[in-house]
């Protein structure tokens, strides 16, 4: 039980440091950009698969 307490304490301290230093805002901005890049790549992949006429892999 003490191990879990220490683990959550460390996680809370790291989250607090990241949240109060402004790194979290930058990381959220980067995450949004990466999300939209991968959505576009997914759509390109789906369209190219549909146009090629290949059946999906089993």
Curated annotation (Swiss-Prot):
Q: Quick one: where is this thing mainly located?
A: membrane
Q: Which UniProt keywords apply?
A: Cell membrane, Membrane, Transmembrane, Transmembrane helix
Report the superkingdom from the record: Bacteria
Give the matching InterPro entries. DUF1328
- Listed GO CC annotations: plasma membrane
Membrane-related topology note:
Multi-pass membrane protein
Q: Which family does it belong to?
A: Belongs to the UPF0391 family.
Q: What is this protein called?
A: UPF0391 membrane protein Sden_3712
Which species expresses this protein natively? Shewanella denitrificans (strain OS217 / ATCC BAA-1090 / DSM 15013)
Taxonomic classification = Bacteria, Pseudomonadati, Pseudomonadota, Gammaproteobacteria, Alteromonadales
